[in-house]
Amino acid sequence: MDPNGKIALVTGAGRRVGRALALALGDAGCRVAVHYGQSGQDANETAALIQSMGSEAITIKADFEDPRQVESLAKSVHDQLGPIEILINNASIFDKINLANISVDNWDRHLAINLRAPFLLAQAMQAQLGDDSHGKIISLNDWRTSRPTRFAYGVTKTALSGLTRTLALSMAPNVQANEISLGAILPPSDIPVDRSRDEIKIDLGPADRMGSLNEVADAMMMLLQNDFITGETINVDGGRHIQ
């Protein structure tokens, strides 16, 4: 797929990884819908940066705990820009809570935001595209989902991998669905990064460094431009997943 002129929706695009991906899409000539939940000012800044590149950008607020707002988000993108051709599932939550302490409400919140919203958006995307159009779905995941201290996050991110593979089959051959599994990624330049290795408290893996937002964006662009990769996980983690 040539991303130029395509309509892209990036969820959670106000800051960090989501902003970097939205900016990369704008730089490639996409017309970008910048979704946000609470970070309205950040989302507006993201959209303004895209517009400064000469690409179209809009912002849309939606609370992913409410399925009606997810459906409204998809409709708003269609009404303002056209059918969603590129869906980037970046929005997620990762509350630090273990099995013994998790509540039903917290469990349901993780399911709604991390899993149900990507499903509903893919369903809406398929309906908007019709039978003859092509599209891409890329979901952001984590190289390590089995974290007892982040129980609901781990379960929903594991399920997101299953959703990605199932979408790759269900939406074939016109839509390719893949995921990017992240390791330790550098924060934006306005957040201090001069932390010692002891402060970071993570094993950086074979690469022995943190990744950059540009490297995540590069992986996304590769998946967008390659129509023969689907149902796949691209690990952008410095090799951490093989240790």
What are these regions (language model features)?
Residues R209-V236, H241:
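C-terminal substrate-recognition "lid" of short-chain dehydrogenase/reductases
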